[in-house]
Amino acid sequence: MIRELDTVVLAHDLEAYGLTQGDVGAVVHCYKDGGTFEVEFVTGEGTTIAVLTLSQHDIRPMYAREILHVRALAETEGVD
């Protein structure tokens, strides 16, 4: 079960936002339907890349034995 403030992992690429499968975000809101979430993705310095409405099929919980990985954010049009 995914809850507010959980760390989650993106299940597939979202090219329009420069996000790739495996990127890590934080759940900032859970909708009442239990399967839709607002997820914030940030840079290592804390700058918000995107806050997106995603379904339970777009994200998964981060597991205790997983480790974070760093990569450069791709340039995208229309995304600051």
At which residue positions do the language-model features occur?
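Basic/aromatic-rich interaction segments and small domains that mediate binding to polyanionic partners
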Residues: 2-65
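Long, low-complexity intrinsically disordered regions
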Residues: 64-80
